[in-house]
Amino acid sequence: AATKASNELMAFSYSHLFNIPLTGVRLFTVYGPWDRPDMALCKFINGILNDQELQVFNFGNHRRDFTYIDDVVNGVLKVINTPARSNNDWIGEIPDPGTSQSPWRIYNIGSGEPLDLMDIIHELERIIGKKGRYQFLPMQPGDVHETHSDVSVLAQDFDFQPTTPYKLGLEKLVEWYKRYHFG
């Protein structure tokens, strides 16, 4: 999280100092085909399929804003060809953290609907047709209990709305995972 925040600050500084239009996107828990094997959903799928114990942190009490890859791509495509502009209504005493007087902008790309991690795991079990075994563990240092994107500015500026229901996205992920790993 610290590196992401410092990246945004550096982008803002360049935009401000050199009047360079810069747009950043914040992606929220991206999942789908070609997901990395070290990410939670692929670990859960692998564990359920292979009867391995699933490590579930924060005793399963996490909430995440899962965003299907197609929705992420659509969101990025909406903003990529529109350079950021200065916000002439920006007021330093009550700043809008997503804009400034510099040509700089930040957009959240997410589903806008945090889901309980255990609901996601149970949905994976339903799709696979098999129950998983769990090892519930405390929250890892530096982790957060919940992520939740506010995509209202992206919706307002670019008419963006995520369109993939999470159950459909999970079905596509499991289908891809089985095809990729088992032929």
Q: Which positions does each model-derived feature cover?
A:
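C-terminal substrate-binding subdomain of Rossmann-fold SDR/epimerase-dehydratase oxidoreductases
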Residues: I48-G183
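Short, hinge-like loop/turn segments at secondary-structure boundaries
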Residues: L41-K43, V151-S152
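Short-chain dehydrogenase/reductase
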Residues: A1-E8, D35-C42, D65-F66, P114
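Active-site Tyr-X1-5-Lys
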Residues: A1-T23, L49-N50
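Flexible, glycine-rich beta-alpha linker
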Residues: I20-A40, H62-R63
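Hydrophobic alpha-helix immediately C-terminal to the catalytic Tyr-X-X-X-Lys motif of short-chain
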Residues: S6, M10, Y14, F44, ...
